[in-house]
């Protein structure tokens, strides 16, 4: 119908209904309660969470006929919290989990690969509420196991669960299930000697390079027609891993500059930078 927007019909609808039934069965096994949130939400809920301003153009914003600011739901954390405020005012109602299967809209900058990256899509999202961190962590493991069963039941057993970046959703712990394919666009790290698995955006490592040599005296050197760190290292006849480069970013909020010093053979992980700064920045070279 449009870029990133598709209609579905038989036999796709039959397949989708079967997958949705599997999702419901597995969510019900871990005591999930199915709900239905509104697609359109008042902007005030998103103002309260701070995401009305922090999320970019992916969030579709509009004004209704009464000049009230509204958003078209791309996720429903705010709506879930609003529901819990009204429903679960007593600690005796905790813990509990609510989930829904709903059409959502995210204004992707580059919709591509058919149904893989679209703007309008169906998503099963779930939200759980607990009285302690320990209870939350235990339930997180139940959810993780439920998703493993889901992938097994739908016939996609070759997925890999990896540590991931929580992105706009926030949180300290996040995993995503990655389907290994040569046409994929994400990279993951798998350790051969342990169970560590992570998306490159969230992966952590310890440098295996140690520099025992003493630093030479500081000296100003003329480097004509040398523009990159590779050019500089070639000019001095050394490897880029033995150098340090500065990368400058401009913060969008107040136009302040952030200078990052990183080993010459590495690149800045901009996802980690955004998480550290709490906002998006633009690179200035």
What are these regions (language model features)?
Residues 1-65, 76, 122, 127-167, ...:
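TRNA-binding/sensing appendages of the translation machinery
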Residues 51-73, 179-195:
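Acidic, His- and aromatic-enriched active-site or binding-groove loops in soluble protein domains
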Residues 2, 33, 66, 95, ...:
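Short, basic and Ser/Thr-rich N-terminal targeting/leader segments
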Residues 1, 24-25, 31, 53, ...:
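Conserved oxyanion/phosphate-binding beta-strand-loop segments in alpha/beta enzyme cores
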Residues 51-58, 84-86, 106-109:
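Short acidic (Asp/Glu) patches
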Residues 65-99, 103:
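Hydrophobic alpha-helical hairpins/lids featuring a short glycine-rich hinge
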Residues 77-82, 86, 112-126, 134-285:
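Extended, low-hydrophobicity, polar/charged segments
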